[in-house]
Amino acid sequence: MHTTLFFSNRTQAVRLPKSISFPEDVKHVEIIAVGRSRIITPVGESWDSWFDGEGASTDFMSTREQPAVQEREGF
């Protein structure tokens, strides 16, 4: 989905199409900058959907090469 950026009172804004707008009860959002990208989430919910989701698939990292457990001196 594409949308436009515009300026409102010298502040850059993004216009969200109705089909992807936030629910009406969302009044505040967090914006996380990742390089040239921006992630917009309701305040306090940035990780909630990930933890509430299905999680990783059963084969996630099934072929991961893990080093042997190291013997370490205790504290």
From Swiss-Prot:
One of its GO terms (molecular function) is DNA binding. PROSITE patterns: SPOVT_ABRB (PS51740). The keyword Hydrolase does not apply. Residues 3-45 form the SpoVT-AbrB domain. It comes from the Bacteria. InterPro entries: Anti_VapB2-like, SpoVT-AbrB_dom, SpoVT-AbrB_sf, VapB_TA_antitoxins. Induction: Induced by amino acid starvation and by chloramphenicol treatment. Keywords: DNA-binding, Toxin-antitoxin system. The keyword Cell cycle does not apply. Belongs to the VapB family. Forms a complex with toxin VapC. Antitoxin component of a type II toxin-antitoxin (TA) system. Upon expression in E.coli neutralizes the effect of cognate toxin VapC. This is Antitoxin VapB.
